[in-house]
Regions:
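C-terminal ends and interior cores of transmembrane alpha-helices
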Residues: 90-104, 306-319
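Central cavity-lining transmembrane alpha-helices of secondary-active solute carriers
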Residues: 56-74, 275-288, 368
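Intracellular juxtamembrane helix-capping segments at the cytosolic ends
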Residues: 121-135, 337-351
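Cytoplasmic membrane-interface "Motif A"-like loop-to-helix N-cap segments
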Residues: 77-89, 137, 291-305
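Conserved MFS/SLC helix-loop-helix module at the cytosolic interface between two early adjacent transmembrane helices
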Residues: 67-103
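Glycine-rich segments within core transmembrane alpha-helices of 12-TM secondary carriers
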Residues: 140-165, 179-183, 362-377
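Short amphipathic helix-loop junctions that connect adjacent transmembrane helices
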Residues: 37-53, 238-269
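Symmetry-related core transmembrane helices of the 12-TM Major Facilitator Superfamily/SLC fold
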Residues: 170-189, 406-429, 484-488
Length: 501
C-alpha cells in the first residue's frame, strides 16, 4: 500500500525548479528542432544557397552546440545557473530573430553561431539542474521526464512550423525567438539555483580535464568510431530533406492524412522528417528501454547501429513515400536502441577512477558526426543527386525515375549504409581489442589515433593549397574546411606526441 502511494505521489517529490527546468528544455528544444526541421530547405529553396554552403554552415553550427557545454557547465558552477540561463536565452533569442531578418550567407551564419552559443551554454545547465534536484530514489524517473521533454518538444514544434511557414518562412525564425524570449521570464523570476557542489571546479581544472580526455587515445578512438553512426543521423537535417523534396511522390501520404479532419489541409513536407524521428522515439522509447534494460551495453549498441543502417538501406531501394517514412522510423529505432547504451559503454571502458570526467566528454561524437556528416551529405547531394533530380511537375505527378537515375539514388544512400557497416565493424573491433584499459591497448590506440591525426592534417594541407593556389580565386568554403582539419589533425598530433613524452 505504501509503495503504491509512493508511486502515485512521485510527481510531488520534485521541487519546483525541476519542473521549471524541464519546461525550459521543452521550449528550447522545440525552438531548435522546429527551425532545424526546415532550415536546409529554406536556405536552398528560398535564399538560393548551394547545398555545399548549407552543409558547411550546419556542420559548424551543430558542432558548436556540442563543444560549448564543456564551458557552459563550468560557468554555471562558478557564476550560478540562473545567470548563465539568462545569458543563454538572450543569445538564443537574438540569434533566431537576427537569422530571420537576414538573407545573406555571412549574416545568417553569424546569427546562427550566436544561437548555437546560447544553445551550447544552455544544455549542461538543465542536465545539471535535473541531477541536483533529484534523489537516488527518483532520479531515474526524473531523467525520464527530462528526455521526454526533449523529444516532445522536437515532436510537437515541427507541426507548428508546418502551419506557420505557410504565412511567411521568416515566422519560423521569429517563433523560435519568441519561445526562447518567453523562457527569460521563468529564468528571471521563478527559477532558483540548485544547491552548488562544495568544490567548484576552476576553469583551469576544466581545461586540464579536457586535455586529459583528449590525450587518451583509447577514448578518442571510441569517439571517432561511434561518431561514424552520427554521420547518418545528421543527414536528417540536410540530404534527407532535399531528397524528400526532389524525389519522393508524396500524394499517397497526403491523401491518407487528409482523412483526419484536424490535419486538413495536409502536406508531407520536410518538417515531418523530424516529426517521424522524434515521434518514433516518444512512442517506443519506454518499450525499447524495458527490453534492453538488463542487457549488456555493447551487444545492444551493435544491434542498434545495425537497425539504424537498415533504415538507409530502405531509403536506397525505393522512392515510395510510405517506404521513406519506414526508413526514417527504422533509423530512429536504431538510434534510440544504440545511444543510451553508448553512455553505459563509456562507463565500462573509461578508467574507473576517472569515469565521471570521461562521461562529461562522451558527447564529442556529435562534434565529429556533424562536421563530417553535414559536409559529406551536402557535397554528395549537390554533385550526385541534384543533377538527376526530376522536374517538380514529374515528382508531383509520380513519374517513375529512369533506371539510371534510380541507380544513382540507390548508390547515394548505400554510401551512408556502408558508413553504418563501417561503424558496426569498428565497434566490434574496438570491443575485441581496445575495451580493456591496459598499456598494450593504450599503445595500440595511440598509434592508430596518431595515424588518423596525420592523415587529417595532410588532407587539411591539401585543401589549404587547393583553396588558395590551385583555384582561379580563393575557395572560401574549402579554406574554412582546411582550417578545421588542420586545427583538429594538427592539434591531435601535438596532443598525442605530448602524451608520450
Amino acid at each position: 500500500m505504501n509503495e503504491e502511494k509512493k508511486r502515485k505521489n512521485i510527481f510531488f517529490t520534485f521541487p519546483r525548479t525541476f519542473w521549471i527546468a524541464n519546461l525550459m528544455e521543452f521550449f528550447e528544444r522545440g525552438a531548435y528542432y522546429g527551425l532545424n526541421s526546415v532550415l536546409a530547405v529554406y536556405l536552398v529553396d528560398v535564399l538560393g544557397f548551394r547545398q555545399q554552403s548549407v552543409g558547411l554552415l550546419q556542420s559548424i553550427v551543430y558542432a558548436l552546440t556540442y563543444i560549448l557545454p564543456i564551458f557552459g557547465g563550468a560557468l554555471g558552477d562558478r557564476l550560478g545557473y540562473r545567470k548563465i540561463l539568462l545569458v543563454a536565452f538572450s543569445l538564443l533569442t537574438i540569434g533566431y530573430f537576427a537569422a530571420g531578418n537576414f538573407d545573406t550567407y555571412g549574416l545568417i551564419f553569424l546569427s546562427l553561431l550566436i544561437m548555437a552559443t546560447g544553445s551550447g551554454l544552455f544544455k549542461p545547465l538543465i542536465t545539471g539542474t535535473v541531477a541536483r534536484t533529484t534523489t537516488k530514489e527518483n532520479s531515474g524517473f526524473g531523467f525520464g521526464v527530462y528526455y521526454w521533454s526533449i523529444n516532445l518538444g522536437a515532436f510537437l514544434a515541427p507541426f507548428f512550423v508546418s502551419w506557420i511557414k505557410g504565412f511567411n518562412w521568416r515566422y519560423v525564425f521569429f517563433s523560435s525567438a519568441l519561445w526562447c524570449f518567453l523562457m527569460l521570464l521563468p529564468a528571471a523570476f521563478v527559477y532558483k539555483d540548485p544547491e552548488r557542489p562544495e568544490n567548484v571546479k576552476p576553469l583551469r581544472k576544466v581545461l586540464k580535464e579536457a586535455m586529459l580526455v583528449l590525450s587518451d587515445s583509447r577514448f578518442m578512438l571510441l569517439i571517432i568510431v561511434y561518431s561514424t553512426f552520427w554521420i547518418l543521423y545528421f543527414q536528417m537535417f540536410g540530404s534527407v530533406l532535399w531528397y524528400l523534396r526532389d524525389f519522393i511522390y508524396r500524394a499517397p501520404v497526403d491523401a491518407f492524412m487528409q482523412r483526419i479532419p484536424i490535419l486538413r489541409p495536409f502536406k508531407f513536407d520536410a518538417e515531418f522528417v523530424t516529426i517521424i524521428n522524434a515521434g518514433t522515439i516518444v512512442l517506443l522509447v519506454v518499450l525499447v528501454s524495458r527490453i534492453t534494460k538488463n542487457l549488456k551495453a555493447f551487444p545492444v549498441m551493435a544491434v542498434g547501429i545495425f537497425i539504424g543502417l537498415c533504415g538507409f538501406v530502405v531509403l536506397a531501394f525505393t522512392h515510395s513515400a510510405w517506404m521513406f517514412i519506414l526508413g526514417i522510423a527504422v533509423f530512429s529505432i536504431g538510434e534510440m536502441t544504440a545511444h543510451p547504451k553508448y553512455y553505459s559503454y563509456i562507463g565500462l571502458v573509461a578508467p574507473q577512477d576517472k569515469k565521471a570526467v570521461y562521461m562529461g566528454y562522451a558527447f564529442l561524437y556529435g562534434v565529429f558526426g556533424s562536421l563530417i556528416g553535414s559536409n559529406l551529405g551536402a557535397v554528395l547531394y549537390e554533385r550526385n543527386m541534384a543533377p538527376i533530380a526530376p522536374p517538380a511537375e514529374a515528382v508531383v505527378s509520380g513519374v517513375p525515375l529512369s533506371p539510371d537515375a534510380f541507380s544513382q539514388v540507390r548508390s547515394f544512400w548505400l554510401i551512408f549504409a556502408a558508413l553504418g557497416i563501417l561503424c558496426l565493424a569498428g565497434m566490434l573491433l574496438y570491443d575485441r581489442f581496445f575495451s580493456e584499459d591496459t598499456p598494450k591497448t593504450n599503445l595500440r590506440a595511440w598509434r592508430i589515433m596518431l595515424g588518423i591525426y596525420v592523415i587529417i592534417t595532410a588532407v587539411g594541407v591539401y585543401f589549404l593549397i587547393l583553396s588558395l593556389f590551385l583555384s582561379p580565386q580563393v575557395q572560401w568554403r574549402t579554406l574554412v574546411q582546411s582550417l578545421i582539419m588542420l586545427a583538429f589533425g594538427g592539434g591531435g598530433v601535438l596532443i598525442s606526441l605530448r602524451s608520450k613524452t
